[in-house]
From Swiss-Prot:
The chain crosses the membrane at residues 335-355. It comes from Macaca fascicularis. It is a single-pass type I membrane protein. Residues 1-334 are extracellular. Residues 356-701 are cytoplasmic. Residues 101-214 form the CUB domain. This is Low-density lipoprotein receptor-related protein 12. May interact with RACK1, ZFYVE9 and NMRK2.
Length: 701
């Protein structure tokens, strides 16, 4: 296969592909042209010759199985290694000598081309060109003509940035699909490596390339000005911008000033219509080779311009996909809409499922209630029954007999305690003392008034509101006297006491007054006997002391004590013993944890703990005008001096340390006079002598 010839000799035949063959080869059932054009014009009716009729080939021919006729034929030696496959077994293109190609180029500019250009390059060509300009500036490589074999990917041209064949510095790969001109490749340095490789099947015209250092022009080119490149005389006023500034297309004869021709046919356009993505030229030359774009347009990598609104719209408008590169990931609106609708549907299904579940549950419960049995109703009635009253309430109401060691406090007893507290507060004027009792504050009053426990039975002796609860054998004629005695002792001007007295006479919860319960009367203990003896001796000592001092003291002779008064005195005596026991218990318990007792802290104005559950404790002291014997209760119930000695008595008087001031509010219970600073209370000194005996009697309990 030679290159195309304008004309063939008179004794030759011109093939359809431009190839010339001898006239004798025409219509010989062999494809010498390569495109079967020498056999298509023949109108032979006879069958092609068989292999048995094949004649030997001449010396300047070779035997080959034709690719077109599928029969053996004789081909000329000139068809071997011509780049065209004539034999079916590729025998005419095998073991061909490859011409030497490639060159080392060291100038600022130059040209190179493929082997046999503009003829077909030999099959299997393998050439390498090394361009080293010796300058650090870029090298511009331009392919003015490029045509490779289009039968496959076998023929290619690889361009590297530098002289080494480094895959990481590969600038571009050109194949038969890039068969258009011009093609421009720019390196980052002054060195480029160009490698051309062709397969052994078929061939093409090849390529022609030029190179130059950036800023220099070839001898036959005209500079565009500055670093805008160069153009040739043939490119002048051809309607195609070869210079970015359009210098090769300006001031053309067929256009006015500042206008550019669309082509050589005389149509022109202004600069403002250049590269605005609107074709003003019939051939669209005003939108080709755009180095810059008008405002509002996007410049593509292939030197085209598109609208900026078309960038990142999921459509390739540039043609090379450059308008869709580096776009942010945006979820489409239809995807969001589908997600919202799906969520609503799922929520609706969930609501329906919950509604069905509740409905099934209600139906199930209704069905279960419809099959309710008698036993289930009985169980429900048992579960809904009211809780029975407590054991203490039954004992207080008199429905059941009391049990030993079971603490019982009836409403009448509670009223007695309240009367005691109110009477001491209103008549005697003692300040209430708040004792922080921590965990024992809830039952301190029960311990005070239930202290006198029977040694034999172990039950507590309760303070009764009525005298007949203690001694049921007393006659009814003494009832007014007892009531009078109580009124004189507890003369409290409050409605609560009257209401409480009236309530004791009213009917109980069961429709009447509760029947009196049998109470165990404890025998006279050693403590009571000792307290009585101490009281009588204290009275005699007090009288003797007054006589020695020579003071005019009016003695009050106590009247004879009736049995009712004796009972009340016994009750108050037991209450006094209970208060003393509390004092003793508090002093003993506090001595383990701290050196100073809670009573000493109270006397010094220091409280042990700021607890919310404090007990308000009153210190009752009977008045001297009482009409019964109070000798047993002459000492203060919480006498701090008996436990702490004389050291605790000093804070009571700042002027006279040796005399203990009387904190009484009224006449003395022993002598009947009002003690002041001029009239010292000598009764207290007599009381101090009996403190030791009282403490010993208290320890017997």
């Amino acid at each position: 296969g030679k290159s195309e010839e304008p004309n063939c000799a008179c004794d030759q035949f011109r093939c359809g592909n431009g190839k010339c063959i001898p006239e004798a080869w025409k219509c010989n059932n062999m494809d010498e042209c390569g495109d079967s054009s020498d056999e298509e014009i023949c109108a032979k009716e006879a069958n092609p010759p068989t292999a048995t009729a094949f004649q030997p080939c001449a010396y300047n021919q070779f035997q080959c199985l034709s690719r077109f006729t599928k029969v053996y034929t004789c081909l000329a030696e000139s068809l071997k290694c011509d780049g065209n496959i004539d034999c079916l077994d590729l025998g005419d293109e095998i073991d061909c000598d490859v011409p030497t190609c490639g060159q080392w180029l060291k100038y600022f500019y130059g040209t190179f081309n493929s082997p046999n250009y503009p003829d077909f390059y030999p099959p299997g060509s393998n050439c390498t060109w090394l361009i080293d300009t010796g300058d650090h500036r870029k090298v511009i490589l331009c392919f003015t003509d490029f045509k490779l074999d289009g039968t496959g990917y076998g023929d290619y041209v690889k361009i590297y940035d530098g002289l080494e064949e480094n895959p990481h510095k590969l600038l571009r790969v050109l194949t038969a699909f890039d068969s258009h001109a011009p093609l421009t490749v720019v390196s980052s340095s002054g060195q480029i490596r160009v490698h051309f490789c062709a397969d052994k099947v078929n061939a093409a015209r090849g390529f022609n390339a030029t190179y130059q250092v950036d800023g220099f022009c070839l001898p036959w080119e005209i500079p565009c000005g500055g670093n805008w490149g160069c153009y040739t005389e043939q490119q002048r006023c051809d309607g195609y911008w070869h210079c970015p500034n359009g210098r090769d297309e300006i001031n053309c004869t067929m256009c006015q000033k500042e206008e550019f021709p669309c082509s050589r046919n005389g149509v022109c356009y202004p600069r403002s219509d250049r590269c605005n993505y609107q074709n003003h030229c019939p051939n669209g030359s005003d939108e080709k080779n755009c180095f810059f774009c008008q405002p509002g347009n996007f410049h593509c990598k292939n030197n085209r311009c598109v609208f900026e609104s078309w960038v990142c719209d999921s459509q390739d408008d540039c043609g090379d996909g450059s308008d869709e590169e580096n776009c942010p990931v945006i979820v489409p609106t239809r995807v969001i809409t589908a997600a919202v609708i799906g969520s609503l549907i799922c929520g609706l299904l969930l609501v329906i499922a919950l509604g069905c579940t509740c409905k099934l549950y209600s139906l199930r419960m209704f069905e279960r209630r419809s099959f309710e049995t008698q036993l289930s109703r009985v169980e429900a009635e048992l579960l809904r029954r009211e809780a029975p009253p407590s054991y203490g309430q039954l004992i207080a109401q008199g429905l059941i007999p009391p049990v030993e060691d079971f603490p019982v406090c009836s409403p009448n007893q509670a009223s007695v305690l309240e009367n005691l507290r109110l009477a001491v507060r209103s008549q005697l004027g003692f300040t209430s003392v708040r004792l922080p009792m921590a965990g024992r504050s809830s039952n301190i009053w029960n311990r005070i008034f239930n202290f006198a426990r029977s040694r034999h039975s172990g039950s507590l002796a309760l303070v009764s509101a009525d005298g007949d609860e203690v001694v049921p054998s007393q006659s009814t004629s003494r009832e007014p006297e007892r009531n009078h005695t109580h009124r004189s002792l507890f003369s409290v001007e409050s409605d609560d006491t009257d209401t409480e007295n009236e309530r004791r006479d009213t009917a109980g919860a069961s429709g009447g007054v509760a029947a009196p319960l049998p109470q165990k009367v404890p025998p006279t203990t050693a403590v009571e006997a000792t307290v009585g003896a101490c009281a009588s001796s204290s009275t005699q000592s007090a009288r003797g002391g007054h006589a020695d001092n020579g003071r005019d003291v009016t003695s009050v002779e106590p009247p004879s004590v009736s049995p009712a008064r004796h009972q009340l005195t016994s009750a108050l005596s037991r209450m006094t013993q209970g208060l003393r026991w509390v004092r003793f218990t508090l002093g003993r318990s506090s001595s383990v944890s701290q050196n100073q007792s809670p009573l000493r802290q109270l006397d010094n104005g220091v409280s042990g703990r700021e607890d919310d559950d404090d007990v308000e404790m009153l210190i009752p002291v009977s008045d001297g005008s009482s009409d019964f014997d109070v000798n047993d209760c002459s000492r203060p119930l919480l006498d701090l001096a008996s436990d702490q000695g004389q050291g605790l008595r000093q804070p009571y008087s700042a002027t006279n340390p040796g005399v203990r001031p009387s904190n009484r509010d009224g006449p003395c219970e022993r002598c009947g006079i009002v003690h002041t600073a001029q009239i010292p209370d000598t009764c207290l000194e007599v009381t101090l002598k009996n403190e030791t005996s009282d403490d010993e009697a208290l320890l017997l309990c």
